[in-house]
Amino acid sequence: MNKNPKSSLLGHLNHLALVIGERNLGNPGSLEATAQYIQEQFEKTGLETRRLLFNFENTNFANVEALLPGQPDLESNERLANETIVIGAHYDSVPGSPGANDNGTGIAALLALAAMFAEIFGDRRPQRNVRLVAFANEESPYFAGDGMGSLNYARACKVRGEKIVAMYSLETMGYFSDEAGSQNYPPGVNGYPTTGNFIAFVANINSTALLEETRSLFQKQSNFPFQTIAAPENTPGVSLSDHMSFWQMAYPAIMVTDTAPFRYPYYHTAQDTPDKIDIDMFTELVNNLGKTFAALAGIGAKRL
């Protein structure tokens, strides 16, 4: 792994939020600059990288994908090579916001995971296919519509008949507080801590089995505080990221989040800047997520 992962994560955050700034069509060239940056960072890890273009209202957009093809050791595990894990994050931000937490943290984590996986797997392959995908157009006015990058991606996977056994949406995941009362919840969600010092794994009912497996694997990595919830999709806030696109295609998917507007006071504002991120907690979180996802992928055969 990068010998200074904290510095690497902070570098990504600063580049996204301060060098590029807000990332949407209102800031000309920002989406292309971000896609190019992500592509270059993926390619530095040695992973196979590609852009997946889609057109919406006569404008081209790009999802950027890094691939780790699966190759099980044993013939009895051959089925695993047909199973895919998708780890994704959106790279756009709302107008007027540099989007350090939403969703610079998701993209910074995605880029760090690519570097981690290149080292963890080394000259071997994961048993399951792993795809790291940076999605365009999660924010309004594209959310849940035909211009949403993750929805285009998930639909294409479904058309191809791909067996996606897990999707993780890395969404607004760098703000933590030890202040009492710093954590809020949508109506109907009760019994959870009121101090916002944990990461949340958010699933729908159909993703409960994946949520339990994720809980078990994450607990083995460290004592990092976390909460899990499997809730109906109409629960306010539960569907508000790219995992929703995979739920629509009946794939199991989980949002990994600091809960965004239920905790983060700078959500969707001009004050969503890198200095708001708890870089120590964020670095520890990304490290633990990397080990969790690698365990789910499994160590397979040597590269051919």
Language model regions located:
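Structural recognition of the beta-strand scaffold that forms the well-ordered cores
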Residues: E65, I85-G88, R131-A134, V165-L170, ...
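N-terminal capping segment at the start of a domain
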Residues: M1-E32, D92, Y264-D272
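A non-catalytic alpha/beta surface segment that caps or lines the substrate-entry region
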Residues: G11-D73, Q227-I229
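Active-site-adjacent substrate-binding region
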Residues: A166, S177-L304
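Glycine/charged-rich beta-loop-alpha catalytic/anionic-binding loops adjacent to active sites
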Residues: E83-P95
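Proline/glycine-enriched tight loop/beta-turn segments at coil->beta junctions
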Residues: P72-T84
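Acidic/histidine-rich catalytic neighborhood of metal-dependent amide-processing enzymes
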Residues: V94-E212, T235-V238
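Extracytoplasmic/secreted proteins, especially bacterial periplasmic and envelope-associated proteins
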Residues: S8-G11, H15, G29, A33, ...
